[in-house]
A protein has these predicted regions:
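A structural detector for beta-sheet-dominated domains
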Residues: 13, 24-26, 74, 90, ...
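A glycine-rich (often HGG/GG-containing) alpha/beta subdomain
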Residues: 2-4, 73, 77-79, 118
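Hydrophobic beta-strand-centered segment that forms part of the acyl-chain substrate-binding groove
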Residues: 52-88, 94-96
């Protein structure tokens, strides 16, 4: 896991085309010492890395991003205010692994993305 102890998987389920995970963020992780001191924010690139790591774990293979069709960071993800995040991933395999993913907690959506991986 690239992100070491930044998060842990609390719950993980999948079907042939979907992954649902609940993760617990570690607000004491060193990444938040610089982003930002006293007011931690989970960087958008880190949120996308978590999606990639969940996919790799479930599919049992390494992935590399090919294209990102859309990506929106809708709300700030402060790990102290929102220690758990539900991540939903829908995917189809064609020439590339096409995914639609979003992260939410208690009805609040934090990010949405459409990505193709190889």
């Amino acid at each position: 896991m690239f992100l070491n102890d930044l998060y842990k998987i609390v719950e993980l389920s999948s079907t042939a085309e979907r992954i649902a995970a609940t993760i617990s963020l570690n607000p004491e992780h060193m990444i938040f010492e610089g982003h930002f001191p006293g007011s931690p924010v989970t960087p958008g690139v880190v949120q996308l890395q978590i999606v990639k790591e969940l996919l790799e774990k479930q599919l049992g293979r390494s992935l590399r991003m090919k294209t990102m069709r859309t990506c929106k960071f809708i709300q700030i993800l402060n790990p102290r205010e929102t220690p758990e995040l539900n991540i939903h991933i829908k995917f189809t395999q064609s020439e590339f692994l096409e995914i639609t993913a979003f992260g939410m907690h208690q009805g609040n959506t934090f990010f949405k993305a459409q990505i193709a991986y190889i």
